């Protein structure tokens, strides 16, 4: 995978966490930059680790599915991207109580919940020629940056940008999956 695709993947994977961070920022009276960075670090580390776990699980199965690996990567990215696009149009609001402070465990649980798709992407990347360590680092750094910004913007922009970010992330994932398939099938020459 080329560096531009890696960059797009990294930011696409961070959009769920960005949307969650906007919600977390909206629950704070006045988000302080230290809380934003702390939240970004927690989410970023988790988001960097989950594609590694998925990649190792995918590599374990690679010898059995190498003939159709590109279809697996495409399908996983298509399903995840479509789910993100669908969720961006879901207008059902969830009523939740506002915490007085964000505990480490609350942030870690939220970070893990938003990184499940990164684990699936990691599994899909096991079937593609990619440096998983640099890809995971890019995902973690992008997530850290997006979450830090999301917490700070949470009070101001609320849930509207969260939905748009998820829509954009879903479209990017579908595009990356389509590119992987097109490259393997040599569609572009």
UniProtKB/Swiss-Prot annotation:
GO MF, one example: manganese ion transmembrane transporter activity
Superkingdom of this protein's organism: Bacteria
Lineage of origin: Bacteria, Pseudomonadati, Pseudomonadota, Betaproteobacteria, Burkholderiales
Annotated Pfam families: Mntp
Protein name: Putative manganese efflux pump MntP
Function: Probably functions as a manganese efflux pump.
Species annotation: Paraburkholderia phytofirmans (strain DSM 17436 / LMG 22146 / PsJN) (Burkholderia phytofirmans)
Keyword Transport: yes
Topological category with respect to the lipid bilayer: Multi-pass membrane protein
